[in-house]
């Protein structure tokens, strides 16, 4: 150990103090597992486990493509690698990380005597202090680590409980007192239920001897992660331990650390002055018309050289505006293919506010992959959430009761390390976000759940009457305006079939009789709008031509004869303003809307017209209508009811008076006269 005054009796190796209770409390305070900020837990990264020396320099590493916190390989650095640039008693204080094994080889290696060798490794080994600077010393170190009466032990440093204050710091290799060791290869076999790793030899003694004779690193360790270590997500900052040899005298030691680093697969670096606006492409200029080829003179006998045809260039990628327009065009094509009757007259509008997409749960057959597919490594800057998911489809994982209504079939992920890839045209909508593939390891380790969904843009379907009504002065609707989304009309198209329940909304697609006249004029209005846009395009084209002419004219400043037009030999050298045509077309459109407004008002009854005269008239009528009706009923039926009530009261009073009078008189008995 660190202090030479400590006794070396085997009985002192066992610490009677029990630290289990504070250690368990410490473990219970560890934070919950989390993936990279703003990413899906199923996303695949290039993960690297690094083993560092005492100066926190990487001396050994292993990499692989896996989701975070699912890959726990066995780390096999050599013991002497941990001593690179380490304490002087290891003999490698001047060796940089990743250096080859230093020192002369043994004279009795596997290839026989070697030039410049030092000592024969077959000679009896002495009890010299084991070092790593020669093959002989590394062979001695191998004997120490495999001997039953010697060995090595490991003490935790950065993550140990606060109660273990007597274990010291890096200067004592975190093993200042007995009882601090949690793992290692010594006869008392230290262990711990809370430490993150276990450390053992990775080679047998016979295997290590032969490797040492060949002048190689021959003391590899086997570092394995414990269950407690697999629950920790602070590996990116690193954890550190101390390792000491159990030999006679003072125990030599060193410190090492383990940390994790990860990065996205394939760098995606924007190029340009503004990475945010790199994809905001401008509208492409119209391709110039090819100039007609001039035929050579008939009398010319010189052979003409045929220039090779230019290689066709690929069209530039679509900008943001083009992508939005493609969404609407794709929605129309899909709707026209499946329901052509609904595309005769309609308006498809791309929703400008969130949510921009919605999902339809579907049933499908996913595929299993033992290695991570390419689409599993696609990085996402944010976790995408579907705020609206409808239908019933395939679910996987631990689905809560609040979301079981979305599940037609619920499956459990089997054990093993593999990936579940969604079918083409679908994605997994998980409680952690959207992802094209799932990691079975993540599903088995967590309580996540996912639903197989189709992703549809929020494109709303409107009948023509709804759009024209927005231009009318009256915004009063007898019923809520129709607003069917593309997901309701085409849900389940990818997996075969239309979403259930669409038939219940077909009656809403039928316009009222008052708007039938508006439907017939849709095509005419669209033609007028098209003409306006065409005229505007001509104006912009004419303006651009003038700008180009002016630029070319600047190159001909020294040509002073005839002016700019004569020098350029242009037939047209003025700006043709067609904005007046645009104003005329828009005026015609407004006139037609006004005519339809009058036609709509003429088709209404006199009573319906009251409610369109002013916005407060409807509120006034609905407020006083109730009291007026009650007052009218009182005036009509009040006198009759009052007379009947008075007559009833009089009858009751007369009966009471008769009863009172009868009780004031007594009936006289008749007298009997006797005959005389």
From Swiss-Prot:
Lipid-bearing positions (S-palmitoyl cysteine): 640
One Pfam family in the UniProt entry: TLV_coat
Positions annotated to bind Zn(2+): 89, 120
Parts of the chain that traverse the membrane: 621-641
Region (Disordered): 287-321
Region (Fusion peptide): 482-502
Compositional bias of kind Low complexity: 296-308
Domain note: The YXXL motif is involved in determining the exact site of viral release at the surface of infected mononuclear cells and promotes endocytosis.
Subunit note: The mature envelope protein (Env) consists of a trimer of SU-TM heterodimers attached by a labile interchain disulfide bond.
Protein name: Envelope glycoprotein
